[in-house]
Amino acid sequence: MIDVKHLSKSFGEVEVLKDINETIDKGEKVVIVGPSGSGKSTFLRCLNLMEKPTSGDIFFEGENITQANEHEMNKLRQRMGMVFQHFNLFPHLTIKKNITLAPVKLGLMTADEADKKAEELLERVGLPDKADEYPSRLSGGQKQRIAIARSLAMNPEVMLFDEPTSALDLSLIHI
């Protein structure tokens, strides 16, 4: 599903990733562990092309995506969900609207279908009563679960999580 070959990423003189090779098969769960600043987030951002690798290639389902144009990158990101370390929820939208916005705007679902999906996902992450709240009214752990629900609403083929449990209560990590 994902094949990384000789991936390197530098920011100026600082080489953050050096000659990374990894194959991730469909259904496989991979955990990247390392100290703060070791390049874990940069690696994830390279996988979904939010960061352009300095060198190397990334293949997604056999297709080299490294040189994708803007349109191709946007299509790829629809297939590859990402939950960010800092959640990136829209503060001026309700929780339900945060979850339904992208699937409706991209034409993947009708508004009614997206609402139903949002309700199912809110139930799944244990926050069915938060649909009409705004992000500022939620705890860090609740925001993180909403970010997970929002990403799942796109029905991605692959999920990338950047520090997925950093704000979660230990009793909720099984979700």
Regions found by a protein language model. Give the residues of each.
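ABC family nucleotide-binding domain
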Residues: M1-I173
